[in-house]
Amino acid sequence: MPDHLPRRQVLRTAGALGLGAAAAGALSSTAEAATRTTAGSGTPDKLHGMRAHHGKLEIRKNPFDTTPDGEAVDVYTFTNGRTTISMLTWGATIQRVETPDRRGHIENISLGFDNLPDYAKLSPYFGATIGRYGNRIAKGRFTLDGVTYQIPINNGENALHGGTIGFDKKVWKAKVVQDDRSVGVAFTYVSPDGEMGFPGELTSTVTYTLDRRDNLRIDYHATVAGKATIVNLTNHVYFNLLGEGNGTIYDHVLELNAPKYTPVDAGLIPTGEIAPVAGTPFDFSKPTAIGLRLRGDHEQLVFGRGYDHNFVIGGHADSNGLRLAGRFWEPEHGRTIEVLTDQPGVQFYSGNFLDGTFLGIGNKAYRQGDAFAFETQHFPDSPNHDNFPSTVLRPGETYKSTTIYSFGTK
């Protein structure tokens, strides 16, 4: 994916999207922005938009709620003076992401709840750390080392995001991590052998840190004892760059570094094909409004009620193994997100199954298209497809992965 596009091409794109002159200018400026990686840091040094004020890095811990079993759930809030992240020990969940727009107006741009019962009883996975296996496994079944394992079915006839009680519904242990460059929390959960049908005792630590340049870095680390297992950890944060509950994301502009994707069947299970995006509604190689082709009659869009597909990330990795997966921007207010990862795929979900029944923070109803998710990952149902990258983790091996959400404005 090119670091910038010719201005004439950007203006043609803006015209196709029905954007006005001001929005077209914002689109042009954002498209011309470049991103580089600071040597040895593994985090992007943004060359566009407002740069973060080097404010004081702060973190605080407060009680949030208590589970029915009497286990305390805490909320950690950490900030660099410009961007503020709130996370729960329940599900190692991102509850809030507060960022300014180009005028300095701060909004929460992530979906979430303000009470524990909604997180516990409902299943939208708002902001949750997902495991032991993110995304779908066909019929909840896979075979490893000659043994067939069954995961509880919770999504049609398939298993989704680790089964009926995944890592999103566990209380994680938390430890503050802070130095002179970043601040955040390391969350740890030990999943016993056989939990949700998965083999092996899996110890997972997921560390969320915010640096002075508005980069939210997620470092995943896992080891297994006793038996081999499968692992696919991710985070299911939902974003709306207008601010949560402030309208749809259909006018958000997306540029994806993904020349291919994995088509699915009617149950949203990959067919095994790795198909080119060229000539399809899945081609976001140039900046395109999310809603432009969303309601087309392409079979894949019909299956997902929109976008709910794994994209195969392209391009070359930097010295830290990271590749740019995609860029989002909202031209009216100017907020942007760039996502870097070392994972082979990313699930782009356009909020198709939000139906107004979820009342989020401030009692706002979340409706179809009110947010998007961008989940870095190995491919869905990988254990049942030999041509997909392996998700097997064996005793003595270490699972490591990094994803960075870089917030900005233009």
Predicted feature descriptions by range:
Residues 1-18:
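N-terminal secretory signal peptides and thylakoid transit peptides that target proteins
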Residues 2-4, 42-410:
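An exposed, glycine/acidic-rich loop-and-rim segment of catalytic or binding clefts
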Residues 18-25:
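Bacterial N-terminal signal peptides
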Residues 27-40:
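Signal peptide processing junction and immediate N-terminal pro/mature segment
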